[in-house]
Amino acid sequence: MNDLIESLKEIGLNSYEAKVYVALLKKYPATGYEISKLADIPQSRAYDTLKALENSQIVMSSNTKPVTYTPIKPKELTKRYKRKITS
């Protein structure tokens, strides 16, 4: 799993973003609280990170209560990264 986090950091995600994305791949949809526990990061940091990932369109949020989050597929993330490099 550390290799995956390092790979995500190489494509531009910071440490928290990589941990949150990996946690979401393991369990989705998930709440911010669940993600903070899975990623082993502070809950407040999880919500900040989820917002940043949502703004980058790497994570989508629901319009439910509680809000749940879903990651984009890894293939889509890879495709976006390749497009970014070639442009």
Predicted feature residues:
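Short alpha-helical "packing" element that flanks the helix-turn-helix/winged-helix DNA-binding module
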Residues: E17-L24
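Short capping segments at the starts of secondary-structure elements
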Residues: L25-T31
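Long, low-complexity, charged/polar intrinsically disordered regions in eukaryotic proteins
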Residues: M1-I5
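A short acidic, leucine-rich amphipathic alpha-helix
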Residues: E34-A39
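Alpha-helical DNA-recognition elements
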Residues: T49-S56
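Short, cationic-aromatic polyanion-contact patches
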Residues: E6-E17, T31, I58-K84
